[in-house]
């Protein structure tokens, strides 16, 4: 997929999400706030359905996983023990010209998405190995036509007369990789204590990387001093570790067992981007599964495969879903093994969920800092040990974005006159669809609204999330529900009044069938159960 196609695809999804009430920018009437998003009527139902599907499949329908709901603000010593206070940071770069901040380890992605870098590469000549040659004349034309608009912060662009000859000679010596070309372009006037790469947004010079702690800090009580400092949790996992002994002592359960939690977390991301994918406020679905150290590798493989298949069962195309094991040099300091479930988003392949073997790191750290014994005594084997932990950790917001991306389709369907027209349809898995069925009276007379209302009430009573709509041509009503991802549309017409049957239209196949009106709730419920 090209950069333009990627942007177009994400723009189309973003537009539909706002138009149909899936996702809104937070505080939009005041210009919004970067890294925060609100979920509209359809979006909140989609998220609720994702969380419910996860809870049913990972907790309620299992005997070895129990739930927990921990406080967002915890004793700050928790984060000292876990290492977050001293080590939960990212390398940050700051552009001295445009004042943008971004993570140093995101530079490759930002280069790939940069407009001025793309136009620069197009101005040169690349060989089969991707090595770029940029002659003086072409560089000068790029500065004049594109650089002055797209890379205003670059010293070379601002003062080409002074720097062009030296830069052109260096670049012209031999073909270079794009990153090497960018470093040469950014060298003129570069201050000390700078990163060699120019800013991917404006071409300006960047500060050297410095560590930036990602935790949101707040204060408890009336005084804002060091003794009152606290943090919004950056992950839900530590609350589970702190309550491990409480669950073990109060609930009749023993290793191997898991503790699950769904909840909000907060990270002061340097550069939130890619729509809802990387936000400062987000929701997590996490399990900490406690097991004997000798069984950890087996349980790790089990949870890794289970979590991958869960996404496939809920509609993500396996060709776009990848299970990637981390190389040894990628592993976090606490992990023996880790795998990412990755998805092909419009902006690139990125992590949807991580599954890690965290060993006994967390429980050991909390035992050291709290003085509480985190060992488990097995009265059958007479062994005392600190359990190893397998952690499947997924994001609700990332899952929602993946399911929306996968569901978005453009195809053709007949209009009211039978003519084929382009339609946009969200082919969400029925378990996740915000609305399961829409009820339409064909016209607002002849007893049809009354009959449709009766079906609507019966569906609601049966627990089927239903939408009632009697406004507009039937074709336009179908289109609205297609964009909302509603699997079934039920139309009440003249035959309904005479013979008690209705038309059921399938969102994906467009097939229609007639069934008794009284059977609609059971038909919808059965169809959803079969998925």
Features from the language model and the residues they span:
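NTP/phosphate- and nucleic-acid-binding module
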Residues: 1-531
């Amino acid at each position: 997929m090209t950069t333009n196609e990627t942007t177009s695809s994400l723009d189309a999804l973003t537009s539909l999400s706002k138009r149909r009430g899936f996702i809104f920018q937070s505080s939009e009437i005041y210009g919004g706030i970067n890294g925060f998003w609100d979920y509209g009527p359809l979006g909140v139902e989609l998220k609720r359905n994702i969380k419910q599907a996860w809870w049913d499949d990972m907790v309620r329908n299992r005997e070895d996983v129990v739930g927990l709901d921990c406080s967002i603000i915890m004793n700050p010593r928790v984060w000292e023990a876990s290492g977050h206070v001293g080590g939960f940071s990212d390398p940050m770069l700051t552009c001295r010209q445009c004042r943008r901040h971004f993570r140093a380890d995101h530079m490759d992605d930002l280069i790939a998405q940069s407009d001025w870098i793309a136009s620069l590469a197009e101005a040169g000549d690349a060989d089969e190995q991707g090595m770029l040659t940029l002659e003086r004349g072409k560089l000068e034309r790029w500065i004049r036509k594109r650089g002055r608009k797209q890379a205003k912060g670059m010293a070379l662009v601002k003062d080409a007369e002074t720097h062009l000859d030296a830069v052109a000679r260096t670049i012209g010596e031999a073909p270079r990789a794009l990153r090497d070309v960018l470093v040469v372009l950014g060298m003129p006037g570069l201050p000390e204590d700078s990163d060699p790469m120019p800013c991917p947004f404006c071409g300006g010079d960047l500060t050297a990387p410095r560590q930036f702690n990602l935790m949101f800090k707040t204060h408890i009580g009336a005084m804002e001093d060091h003794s009152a400092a606290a943090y919004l949790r950056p992950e839900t996992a530590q609350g589970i570790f702190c309550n491990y002994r409480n669950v073990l002592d109060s609930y009749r359960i023993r290793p191997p067992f898991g503790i699950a939690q769904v909840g909000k977390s907060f990270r002061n991301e340097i550069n939130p981007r890619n729509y809802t994918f990387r936000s400062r406020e987000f929701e997590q679905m996490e399990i900490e599964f406690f097991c004997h150290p000798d069984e950890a590798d087996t349980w790790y493989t089990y949870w890794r495969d289970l979590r991958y298949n869960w996404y496939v069962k809920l509609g993500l195309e396996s060709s776009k879903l990848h299970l990637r094991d981390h190389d040894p040099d990628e592993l976090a300091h606490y992990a023996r093994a880790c795998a990412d479930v990755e998805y092909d988003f419009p902006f690139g392949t990125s992590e949807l969920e991580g599954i890690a073997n965290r060993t006994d790191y967390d429980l050991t750290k909390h035992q050291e800092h709290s003085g509480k014994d985190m060992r488990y005594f097995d009265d059958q084997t007479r062994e005392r040990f600190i359990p190893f932990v397998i952690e499947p950790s997924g994001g609700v917001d990332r899952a929602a974005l993946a399911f929306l991306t996968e569901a978005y389709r453009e195809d053709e369907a007949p209009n009211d006159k039978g003519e084929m027209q382009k339609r946009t349809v969200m082919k969400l898995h029925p378990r996740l669809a915000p609305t399961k069925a829409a009820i339409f009276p064909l016209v607002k007379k002849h007893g049809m609204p009354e009959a449709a209302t009766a079906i609507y009430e019966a569906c609601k009573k049966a627990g089927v999330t239903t939408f009632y709509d009697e406004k507009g041509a039937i074709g336009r009503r179908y289109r609205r529900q297609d964009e909302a991802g509603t699997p079934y549309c039920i139309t009440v017409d003249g035959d309904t009044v005479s013979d008690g049957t209705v038309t059921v239209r399938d969102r994906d196949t467009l097939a229609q069938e007639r069934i008794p009106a009284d059977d609609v709730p059971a038909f919808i419920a059965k169809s959803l159960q079969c998925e």
